[in-house]
Amino acid sequence: MAVFTTVSHDEIASWLLDYDLGEVRELRGIASGIENSNFFLTTEQDGRTREYVLTIFERLTFDQLPYYLHLMAHLATRGITVPAPIPARDGEILRALKGKPATIVTRLPGASQLAPDAEHCAEVGDMLARMHLAGQDYPRQQPNLRSLPWWQQTEAEIVPFLDAQQRTLLQQEIAHQAAFFGSADYAALPGGPCHCDLFRDNALFEEVGGHHRLGGFFDFYFAGNDKWLFDLAVTVNDWCIDLASGELDNARAHAMVQAYHAVRPLSATEAAHWRDMLRAGALRFWVSRLWDFYLPREADMLQPHDPTHFERILRRRLAMTADAAALAWI
């Protein structure tokens, strides 16, 4: 989250007249992330203060956004702890602010666990599987907009910034994934609405009696219909690694995948293509971070991520042995 579009106290106070949320007490920009303008919003009504998150969307359109917002509402009504969009007085959950789409959602309690252990990873795996099952009957359809077609489209824009070894790696991996995505095995993989960006900083934990309890997932604005195995691979590639090397931490990876498998059993075909999906997850974020790093947009508090992190992860996944990639331990 970042701030590309600034909003004054008077502007948000006027905008909130269309909501039944009381008076603005504080609006504070959120520095993390790089896609949208995000703010913590505090209001007061009848002597009680409440916390929300205001998001102004910088790339997504009014036509695209209902998929994400209604997915969050759908999951919230099915017991998955996610931010719930707040409707305005007219019932709409998406409105224009400073000429751009904007929404208000509930603020989840807790803090991100940036140094997760196996127990944290197991909780995330369990909720991710429950989220996938809860989304099965979500009626809206939208593909993951940062999948293979986007990687192929973006390749030409980022190749000039790469050295020869990086260009070869990028081109070969996109070709591998294109072949995989076109296979009968890929077509047979189960899927549905996916988060597609479930990193450590997109989940919150509450401390309860000395135990960190998962409080929920947020930032669904990269969500889309995709293969569930891809969503799990993206999550493992962030939560279950040594950050310095990109190497998988087996204890955390096993905990997350086994907890997921206990709720939604993985098929033999999914197990056979685990490494392909770990590679796909690494490629997706290597491409997007190269794009954000070398072709940045101006923003207050913008903090682009280092693209070499996911290059290392991709190289590590390519070097996995067949035994390590087979999920034989689930």
UniProtKB/Swiss-Prot annotation:
One of its GO terms (molecular function) is ATP binding. The keyword Transferase applies. Gene3D superfamilies: 3.90.1200.10, Phosphorylase Kinase, domain 1. Keywords: Amino-acid biosynthesis, ATP-binding, Kinase, Nucleotide-binding, Threonine biosynthesis, Transferase. InterPro entries: Aminoglycoside_PTrfase, Homoserine_kinase_II, Kinase-like_dom_sf, Pseudomonas-type_ThrB. It holds the Pfam family APH. It is an enzyme of class 2 (transferase). GO terms for biological process: threonine biosynthetic process. Its EC number is 2.7.1.39. It catalyses: L-homoserine + ATP = O-phospho-L-homoserine + ADP + H(+). Pathway: Amino-acid biosynthesis; L-threonine biosynthesis; L-threonine from L-aspartate: step 4/5. NCBIfam families: PRK05231.1 (NF003558), thrB_alt (TIGR00938). Belongs to the pseudomonas-type ThrB family. This is Homoserine kinase. It comes from Cupriavidus pinatubonensis (strain JMP 134 / LMG 1197).
